[in-house]
């Protein structure tokens, strides 16, 4: 693959420039074609298996077996086929819990029930785990020998909210004992423990979890072979759909030809699509994925313009032009910014045309407002850089909540969804609801932690790390630890917002939840969007390139 300097024209002398690596994938997804004939041959088999799985909800009566069935269905990525059945089963399970029918459950069963119910929005008390403590108020040492129970409690504990102190204790207790027992357990339990200790299930991107779990479940002697076969066929079917979407988005990006005109920006459109699959991978969210992917591409161009290439004077002009949103009012912009503005307007106009036929053109107003807010936040940071100002943590977060891009991307995804998104939902979304605010804080902090040292090697807006260090007089490592604690606290806030009753439909709430899950993957080891050459490359290959053997 050519280097960036041979692929792109020389930059204007005196301009800032970051040598981002070129696209990992190039035109791979334009040239690749899904094996449609193979998929068609299995279509009938998939429908047959789906109905067999559906019947299991009425034939499986044992509480633990039904919990294991629901857990496996969710982990294997096929739960969207059985939403009504799962909702009914968990509703009955909650009623049984209220009536004390779970008093005799062991640790593994009770923790699994707690996790499934909290995931469904039921506010089950964490006090149910008190019976596993000894007379001194600590978790009983006998539990250390129950690896399945420890893992079940560990996974459940990450659905805690503020005040669930016993779940904080459970995380500490189970982490210590799972690490110590890991060398002594065998597959597939070993792999489940390793994955959990890396990123707990509740915080893991669902589609990647499915890819991992299919391989793990295949090794489970107690697996349900019908469910396993169905999940494999479904994975391949959706992989084919995602490949077609990647082809369409790659062709769109190629036709835009922005890299030739704006060589300073990152080429990460496929990584942006990966992000959207982490939000919702199901077929009926296809349009939302496409809209959000395009808006990620535009946001990346804007970010690199404000952060790296543009002068402050130019950025002031661009921001004012975006605020006016008038195609005939851009003469004052330098040529390269005209390219940006026209591309942005063309993209939003195309989305509006698509929505107009369904009577949903009113949604575009909210997207435009979100883009304007993003531009203003980027400009505020550019002004800080220009003046050398280090803001307070409060000043920084007020702007960074918007520049983290999530408020705009949230709206972008919503406008592509079905009738569950109403004008009232969009009004709620545009006014920074608590859950979105928390997600944006977590996003900014998780971005700043791995990106900090790299970005500070050049002139860049002070990150939350620098702001915290200056304001509190702490060391770098102390500040990083504090930010990690803030991320953990943010997750508790998010968990609380997911409990019933929610202010908007669960499908909308889950967009924010899944956004936050993607962050755990993208920023686990580095800024995996900017440097997409390692883990992100592997993740994309596992979801969209490598097939699962039947």
UniProtKB/Swiss-Prot annotation:
The keyword Repeat does not apply. Its cofactor is Mg(2+). Optimum pH is 7.5. A motif (DDXXD motif) lies at residues 303-307. It catalyses: (2E,6E)-farnesyl diphosphate = beta-cubebene + diphosphate. Keywords: Lyase, Magnesium, Metal-binding. Mg(2+) 3 binds at residues 447, 455. One of its GO terms (molecular function) is magnesium ion binding. InterPro entries: Isoprenoid_synthase_dom_sf, Terpene_cyclase-like_1_C, Terpene_cyclase_plant_C1, Terpene_synth_N, Terpene_synth_N_sf, Terpene_synthase-like, Terpene_synthase_metal-bd, Terpenoid_cyclase/PrenylTrfase. Mg(2+) 1 binds at residues 303, 307. Expressed in young developing leaves and in stamens. Not detected in tepals and carpels. The keyword Magnesium applies. Pathway: Secondary metabolite biosynthesis; terpenoid biosynthesis. It holds the Pfam family Terpene_synth_C. Mg(2+) 2 binds at residues 303, 307. Optimum temperature is 24-26 degrees Celsius. Disulfide bonds: none annotated. Binds 3 Mg(2+) ions per subunit. Its EC number is 4.2.3.128. GO terms for biological process: diterpenoid biosynthetic process; farnesyl diphosphate metabolic process; sesquiterpene biosynthetic process. The Asp-Asp-Xaa-Xaa-Asp/Glu (DDXXD/E) motif is important for the catalytic activity, presumably through binding to Mg(2+). Sesquiterpene synthase converting farnesyl diphosphate into beta-cubebene (24.5%), alpha-muurolene (19.3%), delta-cadinol (18.6%), delta-elemene (16.0%), tau-muurolene (10.8%), and beta-elemene (10.8%). No activity with geranyl diphosphate or geranylgeranyl diphosphate. Belongs to the terpene synthase family. Tpsa subfamily. This is Beta-cubebene synthase.
